[in-house]
Amino acid sequence: MEAAIFLTLAMTCAPQVHPDTARAIVTVESGFNRYAIGVVGGALERQPRSRGEALATINALAAAGWNYSVGLGQINVANFARLGLTPESALDPCVSLAAMQTVLRECYERANGGSTQQVALRRALSCYYSGNFTTGMRHGYVGRVVTASRLGAN
């Protein structure tokens, strides 16, 4: 995905997340592959290259009971119902970025109690990754997002 297209999408679909933060998260989560699928505790032999392949893979994972995340923001299937997502909509770049914004904002609001903005953001990134404020730090996710943010700023 071209940088200008992503910037437009981020500003339109996730306006409450700084574009640099959105870009860093998407860099780490999906590498800008709108059809990316991450399998929790597993891995795909290769990433889908089309919407049809992605939907077939999602259906197979769901039928087998796997926990997985999809799209630009790698939204986890456990969040689909509460965010009003379907496998089809979660693959839409704008919908994925909007869902990313919702999850990240929820995490940030929970993390912000008495913290500096940067501490709260790092805690929110950990929460985005894992649902809590520590796992994303321990597993290096927060560091990868921070690094992606710094690299993209150059």
Task: Give each language-model segment a name.
Residues 2-21, 28-36, 44, 48-154:
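Non-catalytic cell-wall polysaccharide-engagement segments
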Residues 39:
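Helix-loop segments that flank and shape redox-cofactor active sites
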